[in-house]
């Protein structure tokens, strides 16, 4: 199977997001890379499901709370940006202060 660098990046992010999702389900507090991966993964999946950019920007702030992550992680993530493929093309989704 031949993948472009962008496809490899998306696959790696999806894998990391699924691992973070499992750890969160087990009650573990997520670290910085896990938190970012989970937020990005959920946003990418939402785009694939047909949600709008505005909807995903709002949804991105509800994925994780400060109780879901290790101490200090919310302050380390002032914003998250992820390129997603929508039916009408690729768009950048920005989530400001994703963990409250």
Swiss-Prot record:
- Xref: CDD domains: Urease_gamma
Chief subcellular location equals cytoplasm
**Molecular function GO terms recorded:** nickel cation binding; urease activity
UniProt KW Hydrolase keyword: yes
What's in the keyword line of the UniProt record? Cytoplasm, Hydrolase
Listed under catalytic activity are: urea + 2 H2O + H(+) = hydrogencarbonate + 2 NH4(+)
Where is it located? Cytoplasm
What is an annotated GO biological process for this record, any one? urea catabolic process
Q: What is its EC number?
A: 3.5.1.5
Annotated NCBIfam families:
PRK13241.1, urease_gam
Protein's name according to its UniProt entry: Urease subunit gamma
What organism does the record attribute this protein to? Aliivibrio fischeri (strain ATCC 700601 / ES114)
UniProt lineage:
Bacteria, Pseudomonadati, Pseudomonadota, Gammaproteobacteria, Vibrionales
The gene name reads: ureA
């Amino acid at each position: 199977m031949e993948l472009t660098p962008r496809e490899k990046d998306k696959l790696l992010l999806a894998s990391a997001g699924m691992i973070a999702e499992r750890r969160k389900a087990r009650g573990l507090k997520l670290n910085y890379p896990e938190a970012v991966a989970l937020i990005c993964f959920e946003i990418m999946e939402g785009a694939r499901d047909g949600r709008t950019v505005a909807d995903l920007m709002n949804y991105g702030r509800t994925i994780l709370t400060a109780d879901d992550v290790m101490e200090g992680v919310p302050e380390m993530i002032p914003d998250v940006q992820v390129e997603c493929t929508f039916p009408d093309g690729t768009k950048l989704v920005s989530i400001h202060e994703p963990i409250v």
